Amino acid sequence: MIALIDYKAGNLNSVAKAFEKIGAINFIAKNPKDLQKADKLLLPGVGSFKEAMKNLKELGFIEALKEQVLVQKKPILGICLGMQLFLERGYEGGVCEGLGFIEGEVVKFEEDLNLKIPHMGWNELEILKQVPLYQGIDNKSDFYFVHSFYVKCKDEFVSAKAQYGHKFVASLQKDHIFATQFHPEKSQNLGLKLLENFIRL
């Protein structure tokens, strides 16, 4: 059973509908104790890094997530802002500490790239590692992105990249911690396939 963490940051309904399409049992976790009932966790999110961390703290999720993920070793998937929150720090609205599951930081796309920010729309993945999330998904497949910030971290955690002005991290894996900058729930059949792969872990 998958807990979708509700911390007032966005796209819960679309993620829940995607899981329903593939027959996956899920529920909305509105408080930290709810996480104990799940065997997998999902941290979605759209919006500001700083505001999201503030909400997680106020709702009591930060320590609960660290317990469930780092101690209990439950698999977790972070989507978009959810992925960014896994890093050590972000700079949106000033320097802000993240959850620290993965070493690295979250920075804004450079203004001098002459590109529209946010990066919005379909983009091709360069799959760098055959991790479980990409089982049955071909290299150069397209997924849907909406973001103004991107992750900088060690290559050892990067499972895919995409190109927007320069190459950026499209997905991460560190042991049982998985994350995508793109939105699988908005990426049609390939996105559903990725979510199925997460369920099967």
UniProtKB/Swiss-Prot annotation:
Protein location: Cytoplasm
Cellular compartments per GO CC: cytoplasm
Active site: 80 (nucleophile), 183, 185
Involved pathway(s): Amino-acid biosynthesis; L-histidine biosynthesis; L-histidine from 5-phospho-alpha-D-ribose 1-diphosphate: step 5/9
InterPro entries: Class_I_gatase-like, GATASE, Imidazole-glycPsynth_HisH
One annotated GO molecular function: imidazoleglycerol-phosphate synthase activity
Annotated GO biological process: L-histidine biosynthetic process
Protein origin, superkingdom: Bacteria
A Pfam cross-reference name: GATase
Swiss-Prot/TrEMBL catalytic activity: 5-[(5-phospho-1-deoxy-D-ribulos-1-ylimino)methylamino]-1-(5-phospho-beta-D-ribosyl)imidazole-4-carboxamide + L-glutamine = D-erythro-1-(imidazol-4-yl)glycerol 3-phosphate + 5-amino-1-(5-phospho-beta-D-ribosyl)imidazole-4-carboxamide + L-glutamate + H(+); L-glutamine + H2O = L-glutamate + NH4(+)
Cross-referenced PROSITE patterns: GATASE_TYPE_1
Functional description taken from the UniProt entry: IGPS catalyzes the conversion of PRFAR and glutamine to IGP, AICAR and glutamate. The HisH subunit provides the glutamine amidotransferase activity that produces the ammonia necessary to HisF for the synthesis of IGP and AICAR.
CDD domains: GATase1_IGP_Synthase
UniProt subunit comment: Heterodimer of HisH and HisF.
Keywords, in A-Z order: Amino-acid biosynthesis, Cytoplasm, Glutamine amidotransferase, Histidine biosynthesis, Hydrolase, Lyase
Protein species of origin: Campylobacter jejuni (strain RM1221)
UniProt cross-references to PANTHER family, sorted A to Z: IMIDAZOLE GLYCEROL PHOSPHATE SYNTHASE SUBUNIT HISH (PTHR42701:SF1)
EC number annotated for this UniProt entry: 4.3.2.10, 3.5.1.2
Glutamine amidotransferase type-1 domain boundaries: 1-201
Name of the protein in its database record: Imidazole glycerol phosphate synthase subunit HisH 1
